[in-house]
Amino acid sequence: MHGNDFYNLGVDYKYRWGRLVWIGEGAVGKQGYALLNQLKYKILTGYQLLLIHRCYSHDYWSFFGRSFGEGSAPQNENGWYLAAEAAPWAHWKFFASLDMFSFPWWKYRISKASQGIDGMFQATYSPQKDLLLYLNYRYKRKERDVSGTGGKVTLPVFHHKLRCRLAYTPGAFSCRTTVDYNCFRQQSGEGHEFEGKQGWQCTQSCAYTFSGFPLAVSVQGTYFHTDDYDSRIYASEKGLVYTFYTPSFYGRGFRYSAHIRCDLNKTFMFLVKFGQTAYRDRETIGSGNDLIEGNTKTDLQIQFRVSFEE
């Protein structure tokens, strides 16, 4: 994107016909366009279908643009997404989705047009209001340049993810256990053999909200063990207000954090977040100006909010 002028025009629309809902949005910029359309159909109570089509030209650009897609920005992507949700029995819910996408232009780690698929299945069991258990499986296939070929050889990579989570929230106390497993397989250039890398993690989090004092405390601990960066794992944590924090880890080590929030009254809020990552497979962390001598990395975040109300 270059020049001394810029514009971006957009329009959104919605149409409802019985149990069918059509929602869409279109935008055009100085050089490209972006289209997103969604069809949602409610078959019966507890049963629904969702179809999403997206078409983002490779030369479309917008300020702070965010939309549905495989990439992080509405740019250089076409795709169809189909999802279905069903609740055939009491306390049970099933969800399945399939995303077929393509990139008409080159992008990070791929020097030509490419395509891929992303499928997911999740089964959720909730026998009572404060207890939930779910099992999630996800499969993704993409294409990537083979290292050392200068972008002349492109082969597929396969990513399998499995997650099991148990959540118990009896009143002011909540407890959540999560186990993740990753398997990354890449086809090598010689003989088309597969190279497999694995990773797993176990995360335990607990939270408590005091009834007689405006204080909420949560702690979380994670152990991770992965073969390399491709088999890295993600562990979401509570962060500051209006922010999301989902760090990634690879190698072997522990991650623990504490989150304390105090709402003094309707006007003042004070929040402290402390976290530390301790690696067991290295003596230094990072490189260059971010190099840390040692195997531990500590982060501290403090937020103070003042709300003005009439």
Regions found by a protein language model. Name each.
Residues 2-310:
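Exposed, low-structure sequence patches enriched in small/polar residues
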